């Protein structure tokens, strides 16, 4: 990330972080004497213990270990704790608490090549989602311009497919700025080549509407065959609508073309 962009991001996130207050610490309690770690242990030891406890289903111990490690500045523990709050995983779901911790990670920044880069980028994307929709009954209001900026930074600097996809969707709908179909197509193509089936489907829908009926339907059909279960319902609805509008000839051509279309292939 360029220095100017990172400084701007830190300022924006710091402002919201100050507005909502510091991360709340949960009630402290001692680890089991046989755990092999204490709250005085090093941050990485606490993180490893927390990860092991989480995988074993002892999520209360994982939260405790992550909290202590986070207080010692361990980015991975902050990220894990934020995710647990965001999804209500082992703790009561608390989007505001998750937002605060993601903000701390983004505010801290990351050095080029750092092992913390993945946590940092995940925090950017999570913050973008919160800014996009806001958090009801909290000081965190929807800020579509900020959401678009965060997606752009994650998409352009780090090449993350999900950020590229979400940025493209905002460009198509005009969320947080003007509509720009050409830029949206560029980002959809990049996300598709980075393995994002949803981006492949939406790209196909865009060019279908532009008049490239067979090719657009082919992309949607290929995406439907390669997507994750959670994306299947909306991709299927989109593909079926396009299929119903296409001619019989275009349908046959699209089915044939789709068999040679694969994620991450440069087949456009």
From Swiss-Prot:
Q: What does this protein do?
A: Negatively modulates exopolysaccharide (EPS) biosynthesis.
Top-rank taxon of the source lineage equals: Bacteria
A Pfam family: Sel1
- The protein's name in its UniProt record: Exopolysaccharide production negative regulator
Keyword list, A-Z: Exopolysaccharide synthesis, Signal
Enumerate the InterPro entries for this protein.
EPS_Regulator, Sel1-like, Sel1_AlgK, TPR-like_helical_dom_sf
Q: Does the keyword Nucleotide-binding apply?
A: no
Q: Enumerate the Gene Ontology biological process terms.
A: polysaccharide biosynthetic process
Q: Show which residues constitute the signal peptide.
A: 1-22
